Amino acid sequence: MINTSPLLNYVSSHHDIKAINQWRTDVEKQLQDSYENGQSIREIIKARSDLVDEALVFLWKHAELDQSKLGLFAVGGYGRREMLPYSDVDIMILSEDEISEENEKRISTFISSLWDVGNFKPGISVRTIQSCVEQAATDLTVATTLIEARLITGNTQLAKWPRRIVSQTWTDKTFYDAKMAEQAKRYHQHNNTESNLEPDIKNAPGGIRDINQIGWIAKRHFRVNRIYDLVHLGFISEFELAVLEEAESFLWEIRHHLHRLAKRDENRLLFDHQREIAAKFGYVRQEGQPVNYGVEQFMKRYYRTAQQVSTLNEMLLAYFSESVITPRLPNYERKIEVVNDHFKIVDNKIAVQHHKIFAEHPSAILELFYILANRPDIEGIRARTLRLLILAAKRINQSYRDNPEHQALFMSIIRSPYRLYDTLVAMKRYGVLGNYIPAFGQIMGLMQYDLFHIYTVDAHTLLLLRNLNRFREPEFAKEFPVVSSVFQRLARQDIVFIAALFHDIAKGRGGDHSELGAEDAIEFGRAHGFTERECKLIAWLIQNHLLMSLTAQKKDISDPDVVKDFAEKLGDMEHLDYLYTLTVADINATNPKLWNTWRASLMRQLYTHARDVIRTGLGRPVDYQMLIEDTKFAASELLVNNFALADVEKVWQELGDEYFIKESADEIAWHTQAILKHGDNPEPLVLLRAHRKAAQDAVQIFIYTRDQPNLFATTVAVLDRMNLDVQDAKIITASTAFSLDTYVVLDRFGTLLTDPEREETVKNALVKALSQPDQYPGLMQRRIPRQLRHFDIENTVDVTLNEALQQNMVEISTLDHPGLLARVGGLFMMQGLDIHSARIATLGERAEDIFFVTKKDGKPLNNEEVKLFSEKLKAALDEASNQICQH
């Protein structure tokens, strides 16, 4: 038990009412000691509420309000006896009639004393019964607080009034409708998901508010004080109550730790606190486990808990509507459509014909979802049926999974062209999908502790399936024209659906998740009617689901050898088509910020180039001379009407073969035209245009200037100052010692090509900086995003030799931060290295960048130089990461 000094004795011994402040501090320490010694969080928060009661009663008497006919009520969480360390103390002073002048003075004394105490954070309302009626009638928040108003001290005759007022001012239907609208708004504010990276454990879907919501609506109608009382009324089962209470205790415990760590009323489970709170629950990484194992397992428990809470919230409130609200509507007539012997449609929702359907006909579990998938007019599942379904899902075992009828039903759901995503989400939510595919059950709620994967693995997987399904819908053909066309001509679309379902299914197990997932998929495919050849294709897609994105992200896809190597790994058009659709859907399901028209253009270019190689013949070597001649001819056709061919060729003869291999005819014509118009002007030439292949997002910046040691470093430093993010860079040095540089950038503000003044500012800034090669622009100091400080990313530097180019390829992986590229460019400059090309990728909090470099003499670094440079670059990245973490 929690033993505390009686407040009266404590204050008397200190001869000062402000001693309550110290008393509460001492009490809080005792409560924490009790918690750490094993006392339940329920007992702790109730004890804290009771102790606050004691303090308020003392202050009430001190203000001589015990001599009045007023009542002091606890409302909100305090009214429910749910006080966390820094919770608000919400109270209502209620009077039957107008408050006398004398009582107003007493109330003023009471409120002043409450503030004088110091460590209370009071929220105070003073009302008469009449004002309560008036405010409750128009203010849902007031009505809600009255439902749970608890008399602490004072006039006991007032105790009955708060709920009576709500009954007078709100009907069951108006209150239910208002609270459901309020919940929908709250859900929208939290992205309508339980699995935000930094969830608000109080207000997000599946949080404490969802449990409160059940209580508010049920207490309003059934006039009970506790959710427990609803068991006896048949509104909630003992099992459901146990699930809610366990979830509530877990959420309270998290909130308890959040309050103590933040030293305030904090409900957001921020990255700042996740790892530390995970440790308090015992989720600590053991030796040999991934660095984020502990925090990921803790968050997995949270997400699963939130899913349980939101599911019960949905079911119980739907049950209330169907059993209490709807039958009482004027002129209500139940609409029933018989589907078959197992199911009927009642008021547009599917329902079982009788309560033993799932027990007597286990196949009906999947049959229900087959009907949902193929009947877009059905609005959901009736609450009684949902309750039976959730229990029935727990009985899905290996025998159930091995049943050919069940396997055929599952594949019929997967092949449904109508509501695949919504159906699979429902199957997951109600426990069917995770029990039918146990490996999927293991990834439910699994998050990856980073900013790149913004969804849990299960949510990401279902979004991927949604994206694939959208490729066959006309409304999305504009957004994904090429991939939609490719998807619609796939011979077996269900092959890519199963590959999608299993592509990440082995995450969290350790080992290579692609290999393990492929093994699971082969076993599943054989059981579900796929041929051995089809199973191998599914497995290959899972094993190689990152191949296309990594090739586009990390390699120079303008290099024919890169494309040829990629095409050879695929072997035929079938593998290319399936992989392309899977890759585009996967990227779009990972992080909305990851997909843009620049990345789309990379995927499209890689697909079309690989398609051409496969159609031409994989065994044929690249004919570089023919490629160069074809490109020159196409470029000259674009220039012939405006420039003399001799002038064009004079520019071209200064450029090497690599330029004509890697640049398109359109880009060569653009560059050549600009150079010829620029003439002998000594000032650097800077041009901007929308990227022709990437539509609106990406901007091409072309720079023609005398070659200089710090060219790349200066350029990226200026671009960073201009809020432009470099995605790609090509630096070509002509024999005339001029440099032709093309940068692809994304504009953080999206106004670069629509705001002439800003475009001119960017041009002028580049011209000025490049005209003063000895004055390298300093790095701009930017605010470090809060989230970045909590990620422990190992900095890696890998320097290899590209034999064909005779250039060093420098790959870095580090914590992304403002000015990173400018910092790295400056280091290359100080080490006397020339950058010939760069490929930039930002994956959440991680930057994975690739640079091709040589020394000033055009030669690559030798082994000793590589070792020394790698150490210096690694040290610089480590220093930058440390500064971020300490910021």
UniProtKB/Swiss-Prot annotation:
Q: What is known of its domains?
A: Has four distinct domains: an N-terminal nucleotidyltransferase (NT) domain responsible for UTase activity, a central HD domain that encodes UR activity, and two C-terminal ACT domains that seem to have a role in glutamine sensing.
What cofactor does this one take?
Mg(2+)
Q: What does this protein do?
A: Modifies, by uridylylation and deuridylylation, the PII regulatory proteins (GlnB and homologs), in response to the nitrogen status of the cell that GlnD senses through the glutamine level. Under low glutamine levels, catalyzes the conversion of the PII proteins and UTP to PII-UMP and PPi, while under higher glutamine levels, GlnD hydrolyzes PII-UMP to PII and UMP (deuridylylation). Thus, controls uridylylation state and activity of the PII proteins, and plays an important role in the regulation of nitrogen assimilation and metabolism.
Q: Which reaction does it catalyse?
A: [protein-PII]-L-tyrosine + UTP = [protein-PII]-uridylyl-L-tyrosine + diphosphate; [protein-PII]-uridylyl-L-tyrosine + H2O = [protein-PII]-L-tyrosine + UMP + H(+)
Chain positions covered by the region annotation Uridylyltransferase = 1-337
For this protein, the record's SUPFAM superfamilies field holds: ACT-like (SSF55021), HD-domain/PDEase-like (SSF109604), Nucleotidyltransferase (SSF81301), Nucleotidyltransferase substrate binding subunit/domain (SSF81593)
Single Gene Ontology MF annotation:
[protein-PII] uridylyltransferase activity
The UniProt record lists the ACT domain at 700-782, 809-887
Chain segments carrying region Uridylyl-removing: 339-699
Instruction: Give TM segment ranges.
Output: none
Q: Domain named HD: which ranges?
A: 457-579
The primary gene name is: glnD
What name appears for this protein in its UniProt entry?
Bifunctional uridylyltransferase/uridylyl-removing enzyme
Looking up Gene3D superfamilies in the UniProt record yields:
Hypothetical protein af1432, Nucleotidyltransferases domain 2
Q: What is its EC number?
A: 2.7.7.59, 3.1.4.-
What superkingdom does the record give? Bacteria
Look up keyword Magnesium and say if it applies.
Answer: yes
Q: Sorted alphabetically, which keywords does the UniProt record give?
A: Hydrolase, Magnesium, Multifunctional enzyme, Nucleotidyltransferase, Repeat, Transferase
GO BP annotations of the record are:
regulation of nitrogen utilization
* Modes of activity regulation: Uridylyltransferase (UTase) activity is inhibited by glutamine, while glutamine activates uridylyl-removing (UR) activity.
Family named by the database record:
Belongs to the GlnD family.
